[in-house]
């Protein structure tokens, strides 16, 4: 009796080991294609610059940074890639791979291959990158995620506006008068050495003249080391209150959301909202409709570069 129990436990452990060794199956069978060389050096949907010599891939729903293992079902060859782009948008394609991954799968001549997709260990992807650099000394060095090192740029840093925790007014700079009804307590902060514009923080209980929604990423700003005045509320149109936050809860301490009145005001500024990862595209569209019913209007636009889906959120106008 004891021997039968030991055999049963050993069989269960063996099956579990084989399951974890194989990895989680994402797609048992689908078609893979690879990027044309003309895309090399262009930005991807994640913001990275596409490198055809790195082991990367594009998928419609998998989160950026996901590491998967592809197996060519016709010849048994495997490769580990990292998702850093969106696509492909052909009806019968499941994934797009870089040229380096296509060479590893031996699919350059055919252009398309039947593959299976399994979830992989990120450490295995890093090991594959190191081995490839040893065999291909002409390829630029890359980090553990397969991204070539980039030189620091002078672009403006990302700024976050928090109406609940305004920064203290620096010594020697003009601050607004607290306690005056209807007047926002603002601080004139000069543009930094990166050329980023100042951000106005509203005191609790007052109506801010401008509250950035989400994360605003300036496209280009001229360097300026002098203080710039905060725009007055008369130059902006009044917007309806936003009743729900991004997580579904009520918004507290925020009276209104700034709404652009013309396209020139949003030039160089892009709001990116990532709602989550979905296996099916219709599930993502269903969430967009749900958010629209909660007074959060999401405009999905297909970008020209690698067909990246971007969402722009605005409060509805009254």
UniProtKB/Swiss-Prot annotation:
Pfam family for this entry, one: DPBB_1
Record-listed E.C. numbers: 4.2.2.-
GO BP: cell wall organization; peptidoglycan metabolic process
Alphabetized UniProt keyword annotations: Cell wall biogenesis/degradation, Lyase, Signal
Keyword check for Kinase: no
InterPro entries: RlpA (IPR034718), RlpA-like_DPBB (IPR009009), RlpA-like_sf (IPR036908), RplA (IPR012997)
Signal in keyword set: yes
Domain of life the protein comes from: Bacteria
GO molecular function: lytic endotransglycosylase activity
Uppermost EC category: lyase
Compositionally biased tracts (Polar residues): 125-137
Signal sequence, renumbered to the chain: 1-21
Chain intervals for the UniProt region annotation (Disordered): 121-191
Family: Belongs to the RlpA family.
Function: Lytic transglycosylase with a strong preference for naked glycan strands that lack stem peptides.
Stated name of the protein: Probable endolytic peptidoglycan transglycosylase RlpA
Species in which this protein is naturally found: Treponema pallidum (strain Nichols)
């Amino acid at each position: 009796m004891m021997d039968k129990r030991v055999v049963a436990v050993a069989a269960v452990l063996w099956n579990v080991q084989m399951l974890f060794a194989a990895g989680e199956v994402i797609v048992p069978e689908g078609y893979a294609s690879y990027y044309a060389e003309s895309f090399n050096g262009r930005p991807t949907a994640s913001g990275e610059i596409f490198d055809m010599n790195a082991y990367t891939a594009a998928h419609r729903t998998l989160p950026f940074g996901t590491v998967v293992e592809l197996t060519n079902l016709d010849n048994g060859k495997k490769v580990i890639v990292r998702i850093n782009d969106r696509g492909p948008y052909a009806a019968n394609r499941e994934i797009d791979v870089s040229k380096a991954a296509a060479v590893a799968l031996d699919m350059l001549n055919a252009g398309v291959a039947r593959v299976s997709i399994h979830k992989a260990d990120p450490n295995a992807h890093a090991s594959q990158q190191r081995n490839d650099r040893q065999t291909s000394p002409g390829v630029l060095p890359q980090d553990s995620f397969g991204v070539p090192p980039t030189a620091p740029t002078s672009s403006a840093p990302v700024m976050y506006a928090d109406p609940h925790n305004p920064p203290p007014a620096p010594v020697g700079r003009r601050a607004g008068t607290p306690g005056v009804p209807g007047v926002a307590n603002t601080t004139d902060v000069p543009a930094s050495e990166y050329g980023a514009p100042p951000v106005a923080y509203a005191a609790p209980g007052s109506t801010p003249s401008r509250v950035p929604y989400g994360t605003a990423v300036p496209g280009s700003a001229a360097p300026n080391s002098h203080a710039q005045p905060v725009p007055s509320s008369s130059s902006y149109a009044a917007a309806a209150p936003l009743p729900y936050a991004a997580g579904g809860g009520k918004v507290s301490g925020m009276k209104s959301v700034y709404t652009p009145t013309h396209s020139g005001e949003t030039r160089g500024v892009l709001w990116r909202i990532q709602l989550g990862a979905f296996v099916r595209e219709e599930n993502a569209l269903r969430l967009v409709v749900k958010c629209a019913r909660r007074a959060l209007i999401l405009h999905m636009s297909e970008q020209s570069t690698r067909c990246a889906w971007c969402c722009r959120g605005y409060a509805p106008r009254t």
